[in-house]
Amino acid sequence: GYNLIMKLPYKTISDSLNRSRFSIILANPQNQENIGLVARAMKNTGFSELRLVGLQEFEQEAYRPAVHARDILKKAIFCQNLPEAVADLNLVLASTARQRKAFQVITIDQAVEKIRLFPSHIKVGLVFGNERTGLSDIELRQANFVYFIPQSSRQPSYNLAAAVLITLYTLFRQSAPELVAELPPPLPHKEQAGCLQIISAK
């Protein structure tokens, strides 16, 4: 009962989502360290394919924060533009930090639900924009869905790596099997109070 989560094999949770069909796409990233942190976030959540638009190679600054995720950087795919980066994908979702008049913007949870509506074998791309300017309207038109991550009005945008991590974790969390634990019925409240008195007296 209480120890159900401890008894459930880790593999059952982490392998419930076919991550190989997902591509994480960074459009014109500005900061090399952020790229390394994105790779680390991908490694933490089990995703492996990274595509980059507007870059031709990595600098050393990208490898330092990647730690054990350097293999993701070494296998990264470099693309000249966003249409090239998404050409082979069936479903594309793009992240934005603000509301856009030209687009219907949904929440990250709604975005994950959209993904789950489609067959589990299709190829999915998650697109993140430049740290300073985000994605342009032209770039957003490449997406089937545009989503945002709720945030405080005091700090209206997430760091690139944080946005990627939250997105991937949301996918991870919503794809895990539901754990239904049948707990033993609690004692009547009067008996609970009596037990607490006995424990306190020891």
Give the residues covered by each predicted segment.
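Post-transcriptional modification and biogenesis factors for structured RNAs
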Residues: G1-K202
